């Protein structure tokens, strides 16, 4: 692991300074690397995932209360029955584990309600990464699978994309790869490009290579010119790039660009740079899901939905409170070719 990470960091340092980790990410990177060294990739859904979009929350949390209100009384008997035994290796106490189970089931119910394409019926939560043992309606469930289906449902609602289309999808900051996994299952003919910095780029690369064995993976290469990997890139279904490498992609070649909850973790200059990159690469749609307001004390900025540097030529197709997270907004933009 260390050899690959060192190679990634070395290549990143040779690129543009604007893409180096913000102070926020420097701190988070240290935590993520420490967790990787202590617990490995095999346990990432109980460690690293909690740094991304798996929430361990109490009953008074606004998201918990929102999901509870959305569930309706008739579902509560089912929600509160057939709890699994807490595994000894789970670092949660019994009460925390039960709260997590109820919360995850509430989120799953919401995702089922908005899953018009029945993706949850045909996409399973991968066992790799050691997900929390939470079951509902005779199957293993997770927050990440539910959230990814909710996000994809919003995209399909706002756009004219079809599941059989031959698409190029690009995600900035893919976490461990939850969206890439779901989107690749939903769009059998798509190419998926992950743009990220280490250690996240390493984590998503290793995770997706394991859970998508049927797909051709182009792992990270420390290339200076994308022509060096032209043939491998053309043949690959999933590609892993550092940000400065992504600048070499063909302009207006991406049908759907995605970012989930990471733009606020950057400096203002970095946010502007990434919006320019999104505009440069995208010929279709941009989906974003972010905090409505977030103060990044490490880098000294506060950002709101209105504060992002949208290009005036972009057409807003959707902007609303995220269905599962009342503190977040989600938006879809049409980007001119």
State each model region's role.
Residues 164-175:
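Conserved class I S-adenosyl-L-methionine
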Residues 282-293:
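Conserved beta-strand signature within the Rossmann-like core of class I S-adenosyl-L-methionine
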Residues 207-250:
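S-adenosyl-L-methionine
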């Amino acid at each position: 692991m260390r050899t690959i990470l060192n190679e990634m960091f070395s290549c990143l340092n040779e690129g543009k300074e604007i893409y180096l980790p913000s102070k926020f990410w420097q701190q988070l990177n240290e935590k993520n690397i420490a967790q990787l060294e202590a617990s490995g990739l095999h346990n990432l859904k109980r460690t690293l995932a909690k740094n991304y979009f798996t929430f361990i929350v109490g009953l008074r949390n606004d998201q918990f209360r929102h999901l509870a209100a959305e569930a309706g009384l008739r579902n509560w008997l089912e929600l509160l029955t057939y709890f699994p035994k807490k595994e000894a290796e789970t670092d949660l106490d019994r009460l925390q584990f039960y709260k997590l189970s109820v919360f995850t089931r509430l989120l799953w119910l919401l995702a089922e309600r908005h899953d018009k394409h029945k993706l949850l019926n045909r996409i399973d939560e991968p066992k790799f990464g050691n997900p929390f043992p939470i079951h509902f309606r005779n199957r293993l469930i997770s927050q990440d699978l539910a959230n990814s289906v909710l996000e994809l449902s919003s995209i399909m609602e706002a756009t004219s994309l079809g599941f059989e289309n031959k698409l190029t999808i690009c995600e900035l900051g893919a976490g461990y790869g939850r969206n890439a996994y779901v989107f690749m299952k939903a769009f059998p003919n798509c190419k998926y490009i992950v743009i990220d910095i280490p250690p996240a780029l390493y984590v998503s690369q290793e995770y997706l290579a394991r859970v998508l064995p049927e797909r051709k993976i182009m792992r990270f290469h420390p290339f200076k010119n994308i022509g060096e990997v032209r043939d491998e890139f053309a043949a690959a279904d999933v590609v892993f790039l550092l940000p400065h490498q992504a600048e070499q992609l063909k302009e207006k070649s991406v049908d759907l660009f995605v970012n989930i909850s990471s733009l606020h973790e950057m400096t203002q200059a970095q946010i502007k740079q990434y919006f320019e990159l999104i505009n440069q690469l995208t010929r279709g749609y941009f989906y974003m899901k972010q905090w409505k307001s977030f103060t990044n004390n490490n880098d000294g900025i506060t950002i709101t939905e209105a504060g992002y540097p949208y290009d005036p030529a972009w057409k807003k197709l959707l902007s609303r409170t995220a269905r599962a997270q009342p503190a977040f907004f989600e938006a879809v933009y049409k980007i001119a070719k």
